[in-house]
Amino acid sequence: MKRYARLAMALMLGFGLILGGCTTTQNQAAAPKEMTAKDLVAEAKKNICEVSVSEAKASLDKAGYVFLDCREPKEFKMGHVPSAMNIPRGLLEFTVDKKIPDKNTNIVVYCKVGGRGCLSACTLCRMGYKNVKNMAGGWVAWEKAGYPIE
């Protein structure tokens, strides 16, 4: 009888230790804050350089600048900045190093209104590109300014 009592006690103690180990503690790192697309763009804007449409146009007139349109191909076909290169936002990380191998290239990124451009510019900087700017207002602002389009 004593033997069964000890066994029962040992089992209860063992289960107590196991279950006690399943609880969370305050020492564990807090889960990262969930962010919306708007939050991600706002965070990216803090880490990139943005230029106005007129500044971007001045860059287009200079040699040595690459305009990177990060919209989808069907958007690009409907009109784009002259001589712009199209690399959709979703393929940027997998494609850009083949199309723009020199990390010192002067790059002006744009999308339709600015969100994808900000994210793309931030990604390029994180990938080691040193001279990246996002065109504030994107394609909509370029078109509204009456600048040339292809």
Please report, for each region that a protein language model flagged, where it lies by residue.
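Structural scaffold elements adjacent to functional motifs in cytosolic proteins
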Residues: 67-69
